[in-house]
Every structure is written in C-alpha cells, then in structure tokens.
C-alpha cells in the first residue's frame, strides 16, 4: 500500500486531525533526537588583552634585574574555552600569555566569577594555565621569591591579568552554543630539545628505552566546531619552553607559543572562520591553507593593491607628519580586529605541558667566547656557566627564532586541526583539592620490592638554581650539577636563613641555597599549599599541575593516571587521551624524577619539596582518578593563603611626563625620509615624543598603527601593535628623565598591498597636576612597492 493511500485509510478510520497530530509529534521528537545527537555539548570561546605595563616593569622568567619592559613585540592574551553538558556539568580552561599561573590571580578571578555567576564556576571546574613566556611583565605573584626582581608586587600587572581572564571567561560564557569537539594528536620533531640530557640519562635505562626521544614530541589538539558557525577555535598542548626570546629582550612578547596562537588566529581570519553560515566545508579549508603563507592581519576594506606610479609617490609626499594632538580617551581604541563582531571570534591557544627540561633553542648549546659546545654535565665554558647559551633556529636573531619555533607549532596545529576526525564523547567531570606539599606523606617502592613511607619537605632551592639554564645562564661561580655547594655562598645564605639539620637531610643531595619554605618575612617566600586538579571532557583528561614537570616526570604522571582510569570496570577505554597542563592555577617551580633530582641540574635544584616531590604528585593524582571512577568527591582540608593585603610594591609610579619647549606629545622626533619608497621586507621607522605607557595600558587598544590611504583618500588602519610586523619601542634619554620617545618599527610584509602608508602613535601623558591626557601623532606618508 502506498503511503498516501495508507494515510487516507488512517484518516477515515481514526480522524485526520488525530493522525496529523501524531505525525507532527513524531517529527518533533525525531528532530529533537537529531539535535541532541549532533550537539553533545555547549561550547564557548573567548579571549581578551592582558598585555600589561610596557615600561619600567621587570619581566618574569629569567630573574634578570636588568630585563625591564620597554615596548611591545606583540600583545599578550587570555584565551578561554567553556564546555558544558546542556543540563549538566561544565568546565573552563583558560590559557594566559604569561610566565605562569599565580595563586593570588586564581583566587581573585574565582571571587569575581562567584560574584557574577554564583556557584556556576568555582575552583573545582576552572583551570588557569600559563604558556611560560619569559617576556611578560612580572610582579603578579604573591610569594616573595617570585617578585624580588620586580621590586615587589606590581598592581598594574596583577590587575590587567585578573581583568583579562575574567573578560575572556565572560565572553566564552556568552558564546556558549551547541557544538562538537574533536581530538587529534601528532609528533612535532623540531621545536624542542632536552636542555639537561645528563639528568635525563640518570633515569633507568629500561624506562628510557620505551621512548624514542628524550623530550615529548607529541602535540594533542582539540578542535571546537559550532553547529551553525563551523570551527570556532582550538586548544593544544605541547612541551617547549617560552625562551626563544632571550634574557636581554625588553619587548613584551608571547614568545613562540604566543606567536603560534597569533599565526593560527590570523590564518583562521583569512579563511573567514567562524563561518557566517552553517556547515563549514572541510575541503575548502584544506585548499585554502595549502596555499597560505605566514598569516597576517589586514583590514578587509583595503582595496586591491595599487601599482606604484610617480603620481602615487607624489601623493605620498603631499602628506606630512600631522603633529601631536589631544584625543578623547575613547578614540585610542582602534584595533584592527573589531571587537563588535556579530559572530564569535576564532580563538586558538597553544598551551604548555611538561616543558621543564625542554628548550626551543634547538641548535644546541655553545660557548659564546669560543663557539665550541658547552660542557655536557655542567653546561659551563672553562668552568663558567654564564658563557654557555642555547641557540635557536634563527640564531643570532631571537625574533627569528621565536617566529620559526612558533610557526612550526602553528603548522603542526593547523594540520591536526584540519585532519581531526575523532569526536570527543562522554560526560564532563572534574576533581580538585589542595595539599600541603611541605609535609606530605608518600608511599614509595623500595629496592627490595616493598614499600616505605617518606615525606616531602618545606620548600628550598639548591645552588644550581642560581646557575640558571642554557636558555638563560645565571651569574657568579654557580654551576649546574652542584651537589656540594660553596662555603662562601653558604655564609651569605645563612644571613637570610640557616636551614636546620632535618631540612638539609630531607632535601639531600640538594645543597640548600635558599630555604624559602621556612622564610616568612615580610610574608611567605614560597608556597606550601598547592592545588591539584583533573578535568575530564569525554575521553580527554587534563592533569592540571602547578609547576614545570620534566619530560620523564610528566610521562610517569600521565601513565600512572591512565593506568588507574583504564583498570577494572572503569568506563574509560584504552583510547583515553591524557594531557598534562603545566604551570596551572598556581606556581611551585620544577618537578623532576627522583633519579634526575640526584644530578642536581637547574631543574633538580628547583624541585622545591625534595626528592619525592614527583611521587607525591603521582600518589595524589591517582587518588583523584580513583575518586572520579567511583564518582566520589575529594575532601579539601587546606586553603592557600590570600596575601594580597600584605603585598609590598617598591616600583615608583610615574611622576609626570614632559616634552621640550614648543613640542607637543605625538610630534615626530625622527620622521620617515621624505619622498621615500620602501620594498617588501624593508623596515620603516619613525620616532615620536611620547609619554610613559604605564599612564594608560591601552588594554584592547594599541600604541602603534600602520595606516593605508584608500581610494577615497581616507586613512584606514591595517596593522597594529599586535601584529608580528610592527614593533612599539619605548625609551627615556636618561633613567630619571620625564621625557620619553616611542619608536614605531614596521617591517613591510612580503604580501603587503602596494600603496601609500603612514605610521601613527597613540599614548597618554601625565601632567604634574591633573588627569592623564591622551594624544596621537602621525609620520609623513611613504609609498610601498
């Protein structure tokens, strides 16, 4: 019987209205089923500027007192994703372009989220992770040892990070929409090398034989796909240090991971992601990215490239420098990327993993005086550690090394993004607790095959900590691999705090240089209470750790957790993906294996809680995993201190800014040459009379613009200080001078459109009396071939 005849029959027998009602109900239920099947999660992405003070503030990472911020390479961001079950649990993961997470930052972000959303987001389901750039402003951690070189706490650094994290989460929350998640992984072979191979070799040979490399080469990526807009972002985890930029760099930079994120997001924007319409075509994406070069941002309203003619050069010469002028504060925010989009923006984060002993300086370590390789065991040159440096792929150009390592991560992430096909499915879950790592009891195996109970120790740093690493050597006569110490430096140490016998024995064979865990004046020097957290999104499990795990330490932790999750009657199968998110929620320096600790290179000397620190982490994460399997909560008996009110900051504020008589802020000091034409790859620069960037951070704004003359003789912004090609450099003629200069340096991209351009500077000056005043000024115009 045909369907039409059957329907007529049913209508005669039971009444047509009743049949149509049932059919309509069936269609609705079928449609709901399809929607639920297609949208297992709600997914939201967000990002916000956290660049911070671009002047006067010591940079966090190298502990070099002379590394003071004086401009911007490109901006720092907080990037967040939220994944939620439509009627269940949700998790937030935030990746910040900062050296590490900070306990006090995490505390204050959670307070703000509670005030805004109640109990929806809390310490259990929110993770905040740092990429470990060594080129961001410091002073945002609360423990003394991490803010000594920044002259204490820097409120501006702290506030901009807290604000930016909150705003990125708010944006992600507001963007929550039905979507899917895919996971993919693959090896990236040329973005990291082991900087402490002698310590790695002390791990058991049987264990080392299981791995092809002495660093982790695997990148794990998750791809977020909105049901209507298509791909909206990606996060990946890969281990390599943020030390492509050196200890002498003074420009704020996200280093290689920040660069990779910038490249990935620019590539996505070139492709028009997220799409305005549903169902992005993967074939279109593949064909597009195969032809793309290093991504850049350029305004979409710029016309087709102009052919350079004499008339165009003459046109450029008719536009002289504008001279400085006052601005309303709202006029300074002229980002190339519009924040007023009618669709979510594409967000891509390159997260950190077990990078403790992984360097991006892949060419090896060499003595700067002889060009010979450094000593293998101690990383010294004729006994001096300060002469041994690692070399990046762009050596001697640190910017090129940063670009190359960032681009390699971007290209691998792009390939994984494009080929991701394994869909993440399953419930969302999380476990979190705080532990006192200064006295944690740990059961460890003995050589006889039994078990014994040992303890972790109050925090302490060894002599080799002061030797630094091949990414950033220390000073004086310290060296890596020192298990004895030096009588002179022990005398100096004792002026601060003499470690007791129990502390010395607990940390053995580490010779203690700084007994930070027992130093309490003016407040705690090092943390004792630390968070451990495990997040589950389907078959993806993220281990959130507050420190830098070495390669083998991270492998042991991942394997231990995976063994627990896949044993017995667990709902997890062998296809589980376990990633380690380093430098998350708080910071406690390094975690080595027991065997690596014995060698006392930099990483071992910086393992704060003694030789059994890793065993403690493994034990406690196994407990989290067992609790997750059993669907049990994890008790929390400790809380980290909130020491914000105790913070001491000794960095002086800006007193006032000035210019020479007859000169305005924004006037040009050194202009682009008149009647000039520049080729692709050449560099254009102009210097302006400026003021201290600390007067206004121009958050989500810009200090620098490249503008292009369009066909209607309007100046249109095409590059800003978040672009790879444009650098903002700030300087004073003397340390205590009230005068300052801003140099805008633009390297013309190879794919820049030919035409007429100029440079524009934005800033804010502080008078002796009154409020901050914003200003701008432009260079004379020039032609680009």
From Swiss-Prot:
Known glycosylation sites: 31, 377, 675, 685
GO molecular function, one term: N-acylsphingosine amidohydrolase activity
Residue positions of the active site: 359
InterPro entries: Ceramidase_alk, NCDase_C_sf, NEUT/ALK_ceramidase_C, NEUT/ALK_ceramidase_N
Signal peptide: 1-35
GO BP terms: ceramide catabolic process; long-chain fatty acid biosynthetic process; sphingosine biosynthetic process
Cellular component GO terms, alphabetical: endoplasmic reticulum; extracellular region; Golgi apparatus; membrane
Pfam families (UniProt xref): Ceramidase_alk (PF04734), Ceramidse_alk_C (PF17048)
Summary of the tissues where the protein is detected: Expressed in seedlings, with higher levels in roots than in shoots.
Activity regulation: Enhanced activity in the presence of calcium, magnesium, manganese and zinc ions, but inhibited activity in the presence of iron ion.
Record has NADP as a keyword: no
Activity vs pH: Optimum pH is 5.7-6.
Location(s) in or outside the cell: Secreted; Endoplasmic reticulum; Golgi apparatus
Function: Hydrolyzes the sphingolipid ceramide into sphingosine and free fatty acid. Uses ceramide instead of phytoceramide as substrate.
Family under the similarity heading: Belongs to the neutral ceramidase family.
Protein name: Neutral ceramidase
UniProt source species: Oryza sativa subsp. japonica (Rice)
């Amino acid at each position: 019987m045909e369907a039409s005849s059957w329907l007529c029959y049913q209508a005669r027998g039971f009444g047509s209205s009743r049949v149509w009602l049932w059919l309509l109900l069936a269609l609705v239920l079928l449609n709901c089923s399809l929607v639920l099947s297609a949208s297992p999660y709600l997914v939201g992405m967000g990002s916000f500027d956290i660049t911070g003070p671009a002047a006067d503030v010591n940079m966090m990472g190298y502990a070099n007192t002379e590394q003071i911020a004086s401009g911007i390479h490109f901006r720092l961001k907080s990037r967040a994703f939220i994944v939620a079950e439509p009627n269940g649990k949700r998790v937030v993961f935030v990746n910040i372009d900062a050296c590490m997470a900070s306990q006090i930052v995490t505390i204050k972000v959670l307070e703000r989220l509670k005030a805004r959303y109640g109990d929806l987001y809390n310490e259990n389901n929110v993770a905040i992770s740092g990429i470990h750039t060594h080129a961001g402003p410091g002073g945002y951690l609360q423990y003394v040892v991490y803010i000594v070189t920044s002259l204490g706490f820097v409120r501006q650094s702290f506030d901009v990070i807290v604000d930016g994290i909150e705003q990125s989460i708010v944006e992600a929350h507001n963007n929550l929409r039905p979507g899917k998640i895919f996971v993919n992984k693959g090896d990236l072979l040329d973005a990291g090398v082991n900087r402490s191979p002698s310590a790695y070799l002390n791990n058991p040979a049987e264990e080392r034989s299981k791995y092809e490399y002495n660093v982790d080469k695997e990148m794990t990526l998750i791809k977020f796909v909105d049901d209507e807009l298509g791909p909206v972002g990606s996060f990946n985890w890969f281990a390599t240090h943020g030390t492509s930029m050196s200890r002498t760099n003074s420009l704020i930079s996200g280093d290689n991971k920040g660069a990779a994120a910038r490249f990935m997001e620019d590539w996505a924007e070139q492709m028009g992601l997220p799409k305005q319409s549903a169902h992005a075509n993967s074939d279109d994406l593949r064909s597009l990215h195969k032809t793309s070069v290093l991504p850049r941002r350029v305004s979409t309203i710029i016309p087709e490239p102009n052919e350079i003619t004499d008339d165009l050069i003459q046109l450029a010469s008719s536009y002289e420098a504008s001279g400085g002028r006052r601005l309303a504060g709202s006029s300074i925010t002229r980002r190339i990327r519009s924040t007023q989009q009618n669709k979510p923006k594409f967000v891509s984060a390159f997260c950190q993993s077990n990078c403790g002993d992984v360097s991006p300086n892949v060419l090896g370590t060499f003595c700067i005086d002889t060009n010979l390789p450094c000593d293998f065991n101690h990383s010294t040159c004729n006994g001096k550690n300060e002469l041994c440096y690692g070399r990046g792929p762009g050596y001697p150009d640190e910017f090129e090394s940063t670009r190359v390592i960032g681009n390699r991560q971007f290209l691998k992430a792009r390939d994984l993004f494009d080929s991701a096909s394994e869909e993440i499915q399953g419930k969302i879950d999380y476990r979190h607790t705080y532990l006192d790592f200064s006295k944690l009891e740990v059961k460890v195996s003995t050589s006889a095959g039994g078990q014994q109970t040992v303890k972790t120790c109050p925090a302490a740093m060894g002599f080799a900590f002061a030797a630094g690493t091949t990414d950033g050597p220390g000073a004086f006569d310290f060296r890596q691999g020192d298990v004895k110490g030096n009588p002179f430096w022990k005398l100096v140490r004792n002026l601060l705090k003499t470690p007791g016998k129990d502390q010395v024995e607990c940390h053995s064979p580490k010779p203690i240089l700084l007994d930070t865990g027992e130093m309490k004046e003016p407040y705690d020097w090092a943390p004792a209470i630390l968070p451990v957290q495990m997040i589950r999104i389907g078959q993806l499990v993220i281990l959130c750790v507050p420190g830098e795990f070495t390669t083998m330490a991270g492998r042991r932790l991942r394997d231990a957790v995976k063994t627990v999750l896949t044993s017995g009657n667990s709902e997890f199968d062998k296809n589980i993906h376990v990633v380690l998110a380093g430098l998350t929620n708080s910071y406690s320096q390094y975690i080595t294996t027991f065997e690596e600790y014995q060698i006392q290179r930099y990483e071992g000397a910086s393992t704060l809680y003694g030789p059994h620190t890793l065993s403690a982490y493994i034990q406690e994460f196994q407990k989290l995993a067992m609790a997750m399997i059993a669907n049990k909560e994890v008790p929390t008996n400790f809380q980290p201190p909130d020491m914000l009110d105790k913070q001491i900051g000794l960095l002086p504020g800006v007193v006032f800014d000035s210019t020479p008589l007859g000169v305005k802020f924004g006037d040009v000091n050194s202009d682009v040459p008149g009647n000039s034409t520049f080729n692709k790859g050449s560099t254009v620069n102009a210097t302006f009379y400026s003021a201290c960037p600390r007067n206004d951070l121009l958050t989500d704004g810009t200090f620098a613009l490249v503008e292009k003359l369009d066909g209607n003789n309007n100046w249109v912004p095409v590059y800003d200080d978040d672009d790879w090609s444009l650098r903002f450099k700030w300087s004073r003629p003397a340390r205590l001078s009230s005068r300052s200069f801003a140099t805008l340096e633009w390297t013309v991209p190879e794919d820049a459109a030919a035409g007429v351009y100029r440079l524009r500077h934005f800033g804010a000056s502080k008078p002796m009396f009154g409020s901050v005043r914003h200003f701008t000024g432009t260079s004379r115009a020039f032609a680009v071939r």
